[in-house]
Amino acid sequence: MTKEELIQAIKEMTVAELAELVKALEEEFGVSASAPVAVAAMPGAAGGQAAQEEEKTEFNVVLKSFGDKKIAVIKAVRAITGLGLKEAKELVEKAGSPDAIIKEGISKSEAEEIKKQLEEAGAEVELK
C-alpha cells in the first residue's frame, strides 16, 4: 500500500473510525496522541465586516453544556477527539466557556456530524 493509498483510505473514514484507529495506534506503539488543548485566535477575526459577509467554510464545535448526562458526553468527546479520559473530562467541564472547543477549523458537514453525536449524548453544542 502506497502512502497515497493510505491517505485516501484515512480520508474516507468516519470520525468514529478515526478515533478507533488512533486508539489502536496508541496501543500498538505504546504512545499517546493526546495533546494539550490550545485555544488559537480565530482566523479572519480581524477581517471585519467583509469577512463576515463571506460564507464560512471552517467551523468550530463548541460545547455549551453537558446537561445531566456528563459521563455520556465525556465518552462522546473521547470518541470524537481521541483524547484521554482526564483530558476529555477537563474539556467537558469547561462547557459554556470559550475554551470548550471540541474541534476547530473543520468542514460544515463534519461539524454537523459531531454536533449530532454530542447532542445524542445529551450535550448542548454550538457551531461557530
UniProtKB/Swiss-Prot annotation:
InterPro entries: Ribosomal_bL12 (IPR000206), Ribosomal_bL12_C (IPR013823), Ribosomal_bL12_C/ClpS-like (IPR014719), Ribosomal_bL12_oligo (IPR008932), Ribosomal_bL12_oligo_N_sf (IPR036235)
Cysteine pairs bridged by disulfides in the record: none
Keywords in alphabetical order: Ribonucleoprotein, Ribosomal protein
Database matches in Pfam families: Ribosomal_L12 (PF00542), Ribosomal_L12_N (PF16320)
GO biological process: translation
The keyword Ribosomal protein belongs to this UniProt entry's keyword annotation: yes
GO molecular function per UniProt: mRNA binding; structural constituent of ribosome
GO cellular component: cytosolic large ribosomal subunit
Protein family: Belongs to the bacterial ribosomal protein bL12 family.
Entry-linked HAMAP family: Ribosomal_bL12
Subunit structure: Homodimer. Part of the ribosomal stalk of the 50S ribosomal subunit. Forms a multimeric L10(L12)X complex, where L10 forms an elongated spine to which 2 to 4 L12 dimers bind in a sequential fashion. Binds GTP-bound translation factors.
Function of the molecule: Forms part of the ribosomal stalk which helps the ribosome interact with GTP-bound translation factors. Is thus essential for accurate translation.
Protein name: Large ribosomal subunit protein bL12
Originating species: Kosmotoga olearia (strain ATCC BAA-1733 / DSM 21960 / TBF 19.5.1)
Gene from which the chain derives: rplL
